[in-house]
Each structure stands twice: as C-alpha cells, then as structure tokens.
A protein has these predicted regions:
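Nucleotidyltransferase catalytic core that binds NTPs
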Residues: 1-469
C-alpha cells in the first residue's frame, strides 16, 4: 500500500495540507476525531472549529428540533449547517485557495449501564478543490467493543480514516472503502451502510459500494431499495415483520415473484393482528456465494444486471454473506422482534435437511434447526417440479433423507413449515437456467417467463448477455 495506514500519520498528512480547512461537530462519544488532529500537531492548519452540542436543547437550538438524535437525518443536518456556516464565514477571505470541509458524527456509545445498542452515523461534506461543489460520504457503524473507552478510540480512528479517504482517495472509492478499517478490525467496528454523493462521486454506483462492504467483510449484510438508494438495515427492519426470498435472480423470473407475492398474502392472513400486509418488509436476498463466479470473483456487470431487474419488482435487495439460513435468521432477529418468514422452493428446503452442511456445528443438524426456528421464524414452502420426472414436490410429498424424516415431520406438525397454497400453476415449469439460456441464445420464449417490466429493462439495457448473439 503506497499510502499511510497509521492513524497519526494520516492525521498529520491532513494537518500539513494547507489547502484544507474545516469544522468538526461530534455528538455522543467525546471529540474523538478532532482529538487526533490536536494530538499530532499542526491542527491550526486544519481546524477552524470543533464543537460538541451534548445538551439536547443546545443541539436543537443549533440543528433544529428532532425526536431521535442518532439518525441519518441528524447527521445530514449537522453536515449541511456546519458546512454552510464555514463557507459563509471563511469563503470571502480564503475561498480561492482553500477547499473547505465539515466532519460530523452522532453516536450512541456504551452507556453507564452497558446494555444499549452501540452505533453511530459518521460523515464528511467536502470540496475536493477550492470553489468546488460539495461531495459527501456518510456511513453507519456498529461499535462492537465492550468498553466505552475502546469504542471512543475506534470511533476516532475510523473518523480519521474517513477524512483521509475523502481528501486523498476520493478518485479511488474502492480503496477508500478498504482503508476505513486501517488500524481497526471487524471485531471492533462493523460498517453496514455507506453512501457517496455529490460532484466528485457522480459516477459511483452505491449498490456496488454496498457489495464491497460485504465482499471486504466490513459487514455481513448490506441493503438497498428498489430505486438503488442504500439503506441502513435497522432503519428498514426495526420492529417490522419480515419476509425474505433468497435466490440467484439472474434474471428474476415469474416463479420468483409468484413465490414472494403469494407468501406475503398468506403471511398477512396467517399472522392475524400481529402481521399487517402493509407493514411487511419484503426482501430479495442474494448471497455472496450466489454472486461469485466459478473463479470465486464477483462479475460486477452481472451483479448490476440482477440489481436492475430486482429494482423494477419494488422489493428491497439485500446482499449477505450468510450461506447458512440459521445465521440469516439470527441477523434478522438482531433488528426485529416481530414475526419473520423465509419463502423457498421445495428443492431448497431439501438442502436444509442435508446433514453435510452442518458438519462444523457441534450439535449438527439439531443445533442448526433449533437456531433457525427459534423466535417464531417460519418457512413458506413453494411447490417445485422435478425437472427430470415432472413430479411436484410439496411440503407433503418432499422426500428427505431417512435419518431426518421424523425431524421433518415434527417441524411440519408444529407449523414451522407452511405450504404456499394459492400458487400460480402456470409458472411451475419455468426453470431459471433455461430462461438465461434462451435469453442469451436469442430465443424469444424467455420473455413469457419473466415479468413484463423485467423483460423491458433487460432488453433496454442489454442485461445478462441479451442481444450478444
């Protein structure tokens, strides 16, 4: 790496860059980022002001009233307010030679009782060059250290990393993301959302940046909306019922959509007062193992194709590194105490009962299924035709290995495995590999196998190799 990785070196490099000058506004865990710049010397060349409005009344007087303080909206208002104030006060005398910036964070660190969720929003709004339009990077972190002091230290380091990245790596966003955990580890900080915006990042696709977070191990899962806007998982899933479908989605077929639509309707009906249809968060999940090609690399063009077709279906997209369903279930439970359900085809359900997948677990398949179904999680099982024989697999007819038949029967009996009832029989013959093969070979039959909106976007943007032959 031809750049500094140590925090003090980065802070000093920024202090010695006379062309950058700005403000620090930090709430919730001390002035941990500004402190680095004071500590290494030369801060007068960088810091116009550092402020911490700890009192809520004082904070509201500066940034406007709010109900919640550790949220994205508060961070963005802090960045907007402080940057405009800096420009108003300092632009007339040094605007021609100075690129101004504002760093801000709003954080909930470990409390005195020590039982709260520790997380925060961190951001920088900056000019790359004097008189430039602003660019911005914001991120959400979970702080995993058990001691308050260690959390403060980690926050200071990631803040310096973000500022160094914004000033010196803005033209290499991949490297910028990778550098955020210099001198930190994923045991200390998880970054579950990052968003680039503004003039310098007009060509950055935030969906790819979300993918990078998971790819680099900075978070186990990242989300974006149908329109491609990055989402912070707890703000989406918090206290909501969740329905999730996992798939390859290359492309998303009529079967995929019938699965989630019919399961959603049934979820709302079966859930009674506990599950309102409008309240359900529908998520289409792609795992990293489904994204990696044969060589273990992720094809970005293929990834964007999948994101584009999922976008027109109006579902939230999640990229995760959870191969095992029981780990996925634990992740959802981190954010919501409402009912959660996964919908899958009968073929995928059979794999869940394959004991080979659980060889690493001390308690084997029993432990895995115990973890999966605890806390009121259910699986909706969509019927699937055997491509060889044409036999229809359902909850009732699925053949699982002899050793686990009683276990399977128990889960059916207890209502953990629920058959999807009102399915569309006309889509059962659609096989995803066949759709892709027809699409790439120029056989127009593929169009009837996907939703009209999906077909339109594939043809318009020539996704998945359409029109190549």
């Amino acid at each position: 790496v031809d750049r500094p990785t140590r925090t003090n070196e980065k802070a000093l490099a920024i202090n010695l860059d006379m062309g950058r000058y700005g403000s620090f506004a930090e709430i919730g865990a001390g002035q941990e980022v500004a402190r680095w710049f004071y500590r290494v010397g030369g801060a007068a060349g960088t810091i116009a002001k550092s402020v911490s409005a700890y009192d809520k009344t004082v904070s509201d007087a500066i940034y406007g009233p709010t109900r919640r303080y550790v949220v994205r909206e508060r961070l963005e208002e802090m960045l907007r307010y402080e940057q405009s104030l800096t420009l108003e006060r300092l632009f007339p005398q040094r605007g021609d030679s100075t690129a101004f910036f504002t760093f801000a964070n709003t954080v909930q660190a470990r409390s005195y009782q020590g039982n709260n969720e520790c997380h925060g929003w961190i951001g920088v709004k900056f000019q790359s060059h004097p008189r430039d339009e602003d660019s911005q990077i914001i991120l959400h972190v979970r702080m995993l250290d058990s001691e308050n002091q260690a959390q403060q230290e980690a926050l200071g380091i990631i803040g310096v990393n973000l500022l160094y990245g914004a000033f010196f790596l803005y033209h290499r966003p991949d490297e910028l993301v990778e550098s955020l955990l210099d001198e930190l580890s994923i045991e200390r900080i998880e970054i579950d959302m990052i968003e680039f915006s503004g003039i310098e990042f007009r060509h950055v696709d935030n969906r790819i940046m979300s993918l990078r977070l998971v790819q680099l191990g900075l978070t186990p899962a990242a989300m974006f909306s149908a329109s491609g806007k990055v989402l912070q998982p707890s703000e989406v899933l918090r206290k909501r019922p969740v329905l999730l479908e996992r798939g390859r989605f290359s492309p998303v077929t009529r079967v995929n959509l019938d699965m989630i639509d019919k399961a959603r309707a049934q979820f709302a009906d079966d859930g009674g007062a506990a599950v309102q249809a409008d309240d359900i968060v529908s998520v289409m999940e792609i795992t990293m193992s489904n994204l990696r090609a044969d060589q273990g690399e992720v094809d970005l063009t293929d990834f964007i194709g999948r994101a584009e077709v999922l976008g027109v279906t109006d579902h939230i997209v999640m990229i995760s590194d959870y191969f095992e369903y029981y780990r996925l279930a634990a992740y959802l439970r981190r954010y919501t105490d409402r009912r959660c359900a996964i919908v899958m085809g009968a073929g995928a359900l059979r794999q869940i009962f394959d004991e080979r997948y659980y060889a690493r677990l001390e308690g084997g398949i029993l432990e895995a299924l115990g973890r999966l179904f605890k806390n009121d999680l259910h699986i909706f099982v969509y019927p699937q035709k055997d491509p060889e024989t044409g036999t229809l697999w359902t909850v009732e007819t699925l053949e699982v290995p002899k050793d686990v038949r009683h276990l399977y029967g128990y889960l059916v009996e207890r209502g953990f495995l629920i058959p999807v009832e009102d399915y569309d029989e006309s889509v059962l013959d659609i096989q995803a590999p066949e759709v892709l093969e027809k699409l790439q070979s120029g056989d127009e039959a593929w169009e009837s196998m996907v939703d009209e909106r999906v077909a339109e976007v594939i043809k318009a943007r020539k996704l998945f190799g359409y029109g190549a032959r």
